[in-house]
């Protein structure tokens, strides 16, 4: 493919992500809530003069053939996830956990087709839904701020609550059961931290099992939730217990959008793209 400037579009369930690729690098990004997205939202980035649009995601069917005179490439979502994660992380081979509304696990290696290994309904949507039901504010940054102040000991049952003996490989803070200690004394901050921890442990442990099966240690985390400091803090507790390395690349929320463009620029993969 001759194009060197592409606009990648990830039509997600919760949000639409845009990434402008030029000279092999992401130079601009934008995000629009899915419920508010209009095709006219592309106009600002289209002024940069991309030669084509690479679109992926659940809502990619909104683009058909050409748009504003530009060719539209339909890129398989798992291919976009793999290409974006590897390009932004600089890794040659890795398991990718795409944490969006739910979570998808993809095995990616340069020069090989991406493979979808499976997924989970637990993700960012779970976190927002739980917080709204608990009477909290379903806003990622506010949830993160609350969770940073919370105390897991007020909500989760840990090994240290059950025994004072040392258990090899399982330190006292290891969770036995999420929310099993939840009582009336737990604050909204404690609930927020417990909810984030539930998502982190589910994503983290599923990644551990998938990484073992694929015989890989590097796990790239992409999506908006993974950029929250409290998410990174809690998921790295999984890393301390298991032989995996979690990576959060720059522009992680836009990895799939960028990946659509990176994938479309790969000549050997053009046969997988719907024109």
Predicted regions and their residues:
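Conserved phosphate-binding catalytic cores of ATP/NTP-utilizing and phosphoryl-transfer enzymes
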Residues: 1-2, 71-97, 102, 106-115, ...
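Short glycine-rich, Thr/Ser-proximal phosphate-binding strand/loop in the N-terminal lobe
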Residues: 2-40, 114
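Short glycine-aspartate micro-motif
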Residues: 6-10, 52-55, 94-98, 119, ...
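Glycine-rich phosphate-binding loops at beta-strand->alpha-helix junctions
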Residues: 15, 55-63, 209-212, 216-238, ...
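Short beta-strand-loop/turn "lid" adjacent to the catalytic site in phosphate-handling enzymes
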Residues: 28-34, 43-77, 87-89, 108-116
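Conserved phosphate-binding/catalytic loops in two-lobed NTP-binding clefts
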Residues: 72-78, 236-259
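Glycine-rich phosphate-binding/hydrolytic loop that grips phosphoryl groups
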Residues: 82-88, 127-131, 246-275
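Active-site rim beta-loop-alpha module in soluble metabolic enzymes
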Residues: 132-210
